UniProtKB/Swiss-Prot annotation:
PANTHER family recorded: NEUTRAL PROTEASE 2-RELATED, PTHR37016
Name of the protein in question: Probable neutral protease 2 homolog ARB_03949
InterPro entries linked: Fungal_M35_metalloproteases, MetalloPept_cat_dom_sf, Peptidase_M35
Reaction catalysed by this enzyme: Preferential cleavage of bonds with hydrophobic residues in P1'. Also 3-Asn-|-Gln-4 and 8-Gly-|-Ser-9 bonds in insulin B chain
Organism: Arthroderma benhamiae (strain ATCC MYA-4681 / CBS 112371)
Function in brief: Probable secreted metalloprotease that shows high activities on basic nuclear substrates such as histone and protamine. May be involved in virulence.
UniProt-listed Pfam families: Peptidase_M35
Root EC class: hydrolase
Recorded GO MF terms: metal ion binding; metalloendopeptidase activity
Length: 370
């Protein structure tokens, strides 16, 4: 009852207008150049333009080894839909294996096949570009202290559609899974029961309930608390605020029932996306969410400010689904310091800003009441 009372009162929480510390956001520290090295193969050359060593976290960047959204692909001015995964990573106790170290003026190359995460079977002329933010740590450290924004060159490619169609998609959807997914959508079933055991089903249902309450309360806070909205989304523009409120309300609706909604939810992995440190992932092209084994190691609802838990991970993943709110959110940055350092245009489209805002609003009230 105390938790319900805290969530119900959350929207009324008023904070003083104060300044908040930022992790530095450097727009000139990293250079990214794209070149074509095959029909659909792209090479990214990442250069440290600074005068000190950079330890760069690879999660959700151009260097990510998983089939994440590394580039934007356009044909005739329209973006080609992304068919890969949008994961939420466990950000505590990071180890050096997830970083790439670059000396000053040094470069590293990372190649990937864009046909594994985009349907390029139409062939023809495409324009490819990349933009994002790389969390950085100091040499010999894995503590994130800064973030480097990057904007690549525009790469123009002439792609053979037949060759592109022969490339296997990274996220495999078997006929059996397609049948399960279709039945789930026809019945408007959110949780695919066959993917759950008793414990994971209970945890997922509980997370959905908490996600709904957090999103509802955060929506109220967004409309009533200008200082906190400014803190997390870097603006108080009326249009931006309405977009955030609408998205939070949509997440609340999607989370509110395990038997009706626009997404399909799996308690366990079905496509091999649960790589190291992945808590959960979304396939935005299919409005599908998957929990990974380490998701269930998180607390259902944390009492720590800006810590990860099951509820905000579910909330985070729902913002990635276009059926919940369009355009769906991206993964521009992770963690409080990095997210509040994003420019407003990216902050309102970044999934973790929503999860952190919901958590931060709940934690602020929780510490006052308890």
């Amino acid at each position: 009852m105390q938790l319900v009372a805290a969530l119900a009162a959350l929207g009324a929480l008023v904070a003083p207008a104060v300044a908040y510390p930022h992790a530095p956001m450097n727009e000139t520290l990293v250079d990214v150049q794209l070149t074509a090295v095959g029909n659909t193969m792209v090479k990214a050359t990442i250069t440290n333009k600074g005068d000190s060593v950079l330890n760069m976290l690879k999660f959700n960047t151009i260097m990510d080894e998983n089939p994440t959204r590394k580039v934007m692909v356009f044909q005739d001015g329209a973006e080609v839909p992304f068919t890969g995964m949008m994961p939420r990573y466990l950000m505590s106790d990071l180890t050096e294996e997830f970083f790439t170290t670059l000396a000053p003026q040094a470069s590293v190359e990372h190649s990937f096949d864009i046909a594994t995460t985009h349907d390029l079977s139409a062939g023809g002329k495409y324009v490819i570009s990349a933009s994002g933010a790389i969390p950085t740590a100091e040499e010999y450290s894995t503590t994130i202290t800064s973030t480097a924004l990057y904007e690549s060159n525009e790469l123009h490619m002439e792609i053979d559609g037949t060759q592109a169609a022969a490339v296997e998609q990274a996220m495999k959807f078997t006929p059996e899974m397609q049948s399960i997914h279709s039945r789930a959508l026809q019945k408007r079933t959110k949780i695919v029961g066959g993917s759950c055991n008793q414990n994971t089903l209970r945890a997922t249902q509980n997370a959905l309930g908490n996600s709904a309450r957090l999103a509802q309360a955060a929506s109220r806070a967004a409309s009533q608390n200008a200082a906190k909205f400014q803190e997390y989304f870097r603006t108080n523009d009326a249009n931006a605020k309405q977009r955030v409120i609408a998205r939070l309300n949509s997440v609340a609706r999607e989370s509110s029932s395990a038997n009706g909604g626009s997404t399909t939810y799996y308690c366990s992995d079905t496509m091999g996306g649960c790589k190291p440190r992945v808590l959960a992932y979304t396939l935005p092209s299919r409005n599908l969410v998957v929990n990974c084994p380490i998701y269930y190691n998180l607390p259902p609802l944390t009492k720590q400010c800006h810590a990860q838990d099951q509820a905000t991970t579910t909330l985070h993943e729902f913002t990635h689904n276009p059926a919940v709110a369009s355009p769906h959110c991206q993964d521009y940055a992770y963690g409080y310091q990095q997210c509040i350092s994003l420019p407003a245009a990216k902050a309102v489209q970044n999934a973790d800003n929503y999860a952190l805002f919901a958590n931060g609003m709940f934690y602020s009230l929780f510490t006052i009441i308890f």
